[in-house]
UniProtKB/Swiss-Prot annotation:
Species whose genome carries this gene: Carboxydothermus hydrogenoformans (strain ATCC BAA-161 / DSM 6008 / Z-2901)
Pfam families (UniProt xref): ABC_tran
Protein's UniProt name: Energy-coupling factor transporter ATP-binding protein EcfA
Documented EC number(s): 7.-.-.-
InterPro entries recorded: AAA+_ATPase, ABC_transporter-like_ATP-bd, ABC_transporter-like_CS, ABC_transpr_CbiO/EcfA_su, Co_trans_ATP-bd, ECF_ABC_transporter_ATP-bd, P-loop_NTPase
Length: 270
């Protein structure tokens, strides 16, 4: 298994002495769709900020494609790892969406033709090209999130990290973001998402990491999401499909999406 990310005994203290991460160790497979789960305060956002060097470990290390993040390679790491913040207003600052998405490529000192190519491809990938001259503050939340993703895509990273991308979105907005994430993964990118939405995680993810109190309590494939006891012990609610089918697990199995649920029920009823 080729690894995109390796976290080894990662410990992090905030300046006030609060320990946010406590000996965290896990791996993320290359080209996976990985979810980072945990209740509020579990350490998810703090962990994600280590993946492109915005935070520096107090102890331990983070490896990206086998290379330990350090001061010498941090610029190269940030080309490989793109981070999308939970609140797009923390990321969008230029007068237009076009200028915002162009900011990263411009700092790479690319020529104008290459910058335009990257910006156009990134905005079209999130269906925002027609809104390229619009100011960010004139966008809906879903549009802002897509614009923030475009800003990351313009850097052409191999790993895309998103902190709570589904937060506060309506169902249509969630579907749009999910489609973008699936397309990125189909293109060969490793996609890492923190979320509280375990129903969405069960359907979307193929790799799962669960945090509690700054520690990893579970890591592996999505079968973790069918372990209701584990989830609830760590402050998480089991997915609805797990609750509905857990009493019949031995006979019917637990589906990971509505399509599988329908197939199971048809076999059981007919």
């Amino acid at each position: 298994m080729n690894l995109a990310v390796e976290i080894e005994n990662l410990t992090f203290f905030y300046p006030d002495g609060n320990k946010a991460l406590d000996g965290v160790s896990f791996v993320i497979p290359e080209r996976s769709k990985t979810v980072i789960l945990g209740h509020n305060g579990a350490g998810k956002s703090t962990l994600l900020l280590h993946l492109n060097g915005l935070y520096t470990a107090s102890r331990g290390r983070v490896k990206i494609f086998g290379k330990v993040i350090n001061e010498e390679n941090i610029r190269e790491i940030r080309k490989k790892v793109g981070l999308v913040f939970q609140d797009p207003d923390d990321q969008l600052f230029a007068s237009t969406i076009f200028d915002d998405v162009a900011f990263g490529p411009q700092n790479l000192e690319l020529d104008k033709k290459e910058i335009l190519r990257r910006v156009e491809e990134a905005l079209k990938a999130v269906d925002m090209w027609d809104l390229r001259e619009r100011p960010p503050h004139h966008l809906s939340l879903g549009q802002k999130k897509r614009a923030a993703i475009a800003g990351v895509l313009a850097m052409e990273p191999d790993i895309v990290v998103l902190d709570e991308p589904m937060a506060y979105l309506d169902p249509r907005g969630q579907e749009e973001i999910t489609a973008i994430l699936n397309r990125l993964n189909n293109e060969g990118k490793t996609v890492i998402v923190s979320t509280h939405d375990l129903d969405w995680a069960l359907e979307w993810a193929d790799y799962v990491v669960v945090l509690n109190a700054g520690r990893v309590v579970a890591e592996g494939d999505k079968s973790i999401l069918t372990n209701r006891q584990l989830l609830e012990q760590n402050g998480l609610k089991a997915p609805l499909l797990v609750k509905l089918f857990e009493d019949f697990e031995g006979k019917l199995g637990i589906p990971t999406n509505l399509k599988e649920a329908r197939q199971i029920l048809r076999k059981f009823i007919f």
